[in-house]
Amino acid sequence: MAKIFLYAVARQSDATALERAKSLINTSHSIDGVHPMLSLMVPLADDPFGYVPGVSFERPSFVIEIAQPMGKPLEPAIRLLQPQLTSLLELLDRNKTQVLAGYHRAFKVTGKNQLIYHYLMQKKAGFRSVDYLDYYANNHCQFGIATPGIDYYQTYKDAEFTHELAQRWGVVAATAENVSEMHMNDVNELLHGEGIAEVSRGALADEELFVDRPNSRMFTMQLIARRTL
């Protein structure tokens, strides 16, 4: 599955921009057999993962996800949604809004989706993208699979497409190498699930090998709308 994340930061009113984002999700219509899957998420006000603001990544007002099924290109979906996206972008701070496009892979799926955790991960100095992603996809993913109480996904960035979209929309290209996604119905399942302490220790130790943790960003969101056109 190919996917785009738009980490939207409102220029003035979060509420006004969010209403326009809801309109994009709820009023768009399929044309010529193009059926993108759209999702809208808002960060939790009391996020237990302690989002730390940073110069490189502003806390988003909301996040829009645009996805196409395997074998279906994203470009027709973008053309379909472009009028609504253009209207939405007028309300966003384009110097803080970021986009990331990539290949989405499902590792563990049971249908949990009320809360969605994103971890935008940066590679450690000395690692090329190929080095980083090779280690992640073939080794580090074991910790996400072993985490109890969650569904687990990865989106690996397509740097060329991400930069192209950033230029097209006048926003910032995300510098993260990937987005680690954990979906859950209750954040306590992740915080206090049986065996989570041991998995967390192993994951943190492994990340020290290849992840630039101080410049990576994590936060949890509430899914408020999802629709396939």
Where are these regions (language model features)?
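Macromolecular interaction modules
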Residues: 1-229
